Amino acid sequence: MPTKIRISKDMILDAAFEIARQEGMEKLSNRELAKKLKCSIRPIYYQFENVEEMQKELYIKIEQYFYEFLLDNMVEGIPQYKQIGINYIRFAKREKQLFQTVQIKFS
């Protein structure tokens, strides 16, 4: 009978997202992830072939969060382009580390 997976891919990505959000992408490592998840680095390598694969999926998660943030809280009567601009500035203020990641990754 195969062993039960206790650390899922989603759990790893969520922990990586929180590290990137609080401390920045430069602090993200398998050791930091393992520490946050309270496990060894083995489950991380079990779910992802390498760090690049995990980072690729993390960038997708960050990008989705960024676009959802931009499109949230739309108010009727205000042009959409203005609201997106305001939300862009809000994102930069509230999510400093993720904003840097978005700017570096997509510039």
Each predicted region: which residue ranges?
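N-terminal intrinsically disordered/low-complexity leader segments
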Residues: 1-7
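Tryptophan-centric aromatic hotspots in well-structured domains and transmembrane helices
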Residues: 3, 48-49, 85
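Alpha-helix N-cap/helix-start motif at coil-to-helix transitions, marked by capping-box chemistry
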Residues: 6, 31, 60, 92-93
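Helix-turn-helix
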Residues: 11, 19-53, 57
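Alpha-helical structural segments
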Residues: 11-18, 53-79, 83-90, 105
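Alpha-helix N-cap and coil->helix boundary residues
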Residues: 28-29, 80-83, 97
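Short secondary-structure transition hinges
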Residues: 90, 94-107
